[in-house]
From Swiss-Prot:
Recorded GO CC terms: cytosolic small ribosomal subunit
Organism taxonomic ancestry: Bacteria, Pseudomonadati, Spirochaetota, Spirochaetia, Spirochaetales
Protein's name in the database: Small ribosomal subunit protein uS9
Species this protein is from: Borreliella burgdorferi (strain ATCC 35210 / DSM 4680 / CIP 102532 / B31) (Borrelia burgdorferi)
Family: Belongs to the universal ribosomal protein uS9 family.
Keyword Signal: no
Length: 136
């Protein structure tokens, strides 16, 4: 795992993915400011349950308020983006301090959630749903 030095400040980067969303998370020591796509975290993710889900790695490792986060996220909807942010924060925290590995791994935050939307098949209405069958 590689740490990069950015203007004499220790900076850690993690990439998170979920559904079709990709989040690049940059962490450095600071006062707890969180920016997502140059917007405030609370204004970008407005649903409370998605906010708590995205910040759960910081709460779990007792580092909420100790680091500044700059997050660049694109693709998908707000739920997939929140999951990608959580995955990216977990990876960046692991790169910053490897003692976090056991906590994050046991809660499944370092594992990529591989579930994606199943494609629609021809001859069917949706991915699994068939057209109505008429016997006569």
């Amino acid at each position: 795992m590689k740490k990069s030095n950015f203007s004499n400040v220790n900076l850690s980067m993690g990439t998170g993915r979920r559904k079709s969303s990709v989040a690049r998370v940059y962490i450095r020591e600071g006062s707890g400011n969180i920016k997502v796509n140059n917007r405030d975290f609370d204004s970008y993710i407005q649903l409370e349950n998605l906010r708590t889900m995205a910040l759960s790695p910081l709460v779990l490792t007792n580092t909420l308020g100790k680091y500044d986060l700059y997050i660049n996220v694109y693709g998908g909807g707000i739920s997939g983006q929140s999951g990608a942010i959580r995955h990216g924060i977990s990876r960046a925290l692991f790169k910053l301090d490897e003692s976090n590995k056991m906590i994050l791994r046991s809660n499944g935050f370092l594992t990529r959630d591989s579930r994606k939307v199943e494609r629609k098949k021809f001859g069917q209405k949706k991915a699994r749903k068939s057209f109505q069958f008429s016997k006569r």
